[in-house]
Amino acid sequence: MSKSVAKITFYDDKNFQGHHYECDSDCPDFHTYLSCCNSIRVTGGAWVVYERPNFSGNMYILTQGDYPDYHHWRGLNDRLSSCKVIHLSSGGQYKLQIFERGDFSGQMYETTEDCPSVMEQFHIREIQSCKVLDGVWVFYEQPNYYGRQYFLDKKEYRKPVDWGSPCSAVQSFRRIME
C-alpha cells in the first residue's frame, strides 16, 4: 500500500482559475507568489493552511479534494500565506481524552469518533484540557465543525492556549483522515 504524495495548489481566482502556486512540502511564506487565494485543490495528503506567514493566524485543515472558493474551506477571507503537511498517524488509530477543567481535572471523556456537538454528546459546556493519545484531530469553536479551527497532534494539552486558542470555546471536533 503506497502512501500518497502530499500536494496542494493555490489559485488566486475562484474555480481554479488565474495564477497558481503548487506546494509538496511545508512552505512558511508563499504570499509573494499569490496576492490572494480564492480556490485550492488538494491532490495528496492533508494540510494545515494559515492566513499569515510563518504558520500563524487563523488556520484551516484541508484534506484531499477541491475547494472552489474560500467558503468551501470555511475561510473568513481570501488571505493565505503559509502551509504545512499533516503527518497522519500510521495504522489509522484515533483516541482522544477531553477534560472539562484545565490540567486534566474534572470529568474526563474518552472518544475515538468525531463529535459534531460537545454539549449534546458529553453534556459539558467547554473543553479545558485534553490528551491526544492517537491520531491527529481538529477542534472547532462552534458546533457542526464551524468557526476557528485548531490542529492537535499526539501530545497533552493542559489548557486551551496550548492548542492555540485564547478561550475554551470548543464545541465540536473530528479526526483528520486522508
From Swiss-Prot:
Q: Does the keyword Cytoplasm apply?
A: no
Q: Which residues form the Beta/gamma crystallin 'Greek key' domain?
A: 6-44, 45-87, 94-134, 135-177
Task: Write out the ranges of the annotated region (N-terminal arm).
Answer: 2-5
Location of region: Connecting peptide: 88-93
UniProt keyword terms in alphabetical order: Acetylation, Eye lens protein, Repeat
Name the Gene Ontology biological process terms. Answer: lens development in camera-type eye; visual perception
A GO molecular function term, named singly, is: structural constituent of eye lens
The cross-references to InterPro entries, in alphabetical order and at most eight, read: Beta/Gamma-Crystallin, Beta/gamma_crystallin, G_crystallin-like
Q: Which residues carry this modification: N-acetylserine?
A: S2
Q: Does the keyword Acetylation apply?
A: yes
- Read off the SUPFAM superfamilies from this record: gamma-Crystallin-like (SSF49695)
User: What is known about what this protein does?
Assistant: Crystallins are the dominant structural components of the vertebrate eye lens.
- Written domain comment of the UniProt record: Has a two-domain beta-structure, folded into four very similar Greek key motifs.
Q: Which family does the entry's similarity section mention? A: Belongs to the beta/gamma-crystallin family.
- Any idea what this protein is called? Gamma-crystallin S
Species name: Macropus fuliginosus
